[in-house]
Amino acid sequence: MQNITQSWFVQGMIKATTDAWLKGWDERNGGNLTLRLDDADIAPYHGNFHAQPRYIPLSQPMPLLANTPFIVTGSGKFFRNVQLDPAANLGVVKVDSDGAGYHILWGLTNEAVPTSELPAHFLSHCERIKATNGKDRVIMHCHATNLIALTYVLENDTAVFTRQLWEGSTECLVVFPDGVGILPWMVPGTDEIGQATAQEMQKHSLVLWPFHGVFSSGPTLDETFGLIDTAEKSAQVLVKGYSMGGMKQTISREELIALGQRFGVTPLASALAL
């Protein structure tokens, strides 16, 4: 029998959660991560599944995700501990045939449940499936320090925040030309913040929760992690620049346009217009 802990998706989750903890983005039980799988991914590991999978209803039906398996982080679980005990901190779940709930097929031992942000993740998965024709498979939420810090000092406006991050590091416009969506402060772990995040995910692969953290979407664990890493590096540069008295020069609009043309991307118009 093949051991599911050696599968590419469990090993990938271990690496992503460990890297995020080492970055300082996921203190205590902060942060959550979900990866959409295919039946073929989990088929070799049926022998590892729970004999009687627990069923948990969703707070709202999501028929677009019917019959879809995911690997998810658990509620109250520490990212730093995923590498030590994957089965206790991760779970493979599969949405039922009408999208009304899911079964926990593997992991989440001792009656653990998926992350409390699962509504936000699943709603965002639905929107990214539609926006990318199924290409995006990962949703990641973490507490990236410098991005959070900027939400206290910059106007929490998509165009303003995006333009500042683009100017903070040359690669940013290339990596996220679609800009950064921003919500008002909202109570986490609710359908309301999940719906608001998903609405922004229709247009942006990166969404900020002011004074809290960031949501990211991408086709792979590496791409999704790298998107946050890139934005966070720019935020770090901006924080350092502001602390040294502010910027004396920056990347101009004309240079941003040239950058987009060179790499074949279309920058968010509202941010470019500032």
From Swiss-Prot:
Pathway field: Carbohydrate degradation; L-rhamnose degradation; glycerone phosphate from L-rhamnose: step 3/3
Pfam families for this protein: Aldolase_II
Details of cofactor binding: Binds 1 zinc ion per subunit.
Catalytic activity: L-rhamnulose 1-phosphate = (S)-lactaldehyde + dihydroxyacetone phosphate
Gene3D superfamilies given in the database record: Class II aldolase/adducin N-terminal domain (3.40.225.10)
Residues at which Zn(2+) binds: H141, H143, H212
Function of the protein: Catalyzes the reversible cleavage of L-rhamnulose-1-phosphate to dihydroxyacetone phosphate (DHAP) and L-lactaldehyde.
Family, as annotated: Belongs to the aldolase class II family. RhaD subfamily.
Assembly and oligomerization: Homotetramer.
Record protein name field: Rhamnulose-1-phosphate aldolase
Organism: Escherichia coli O7:K1 (strain IAI39 / ExPEC)
Gene: rhaD
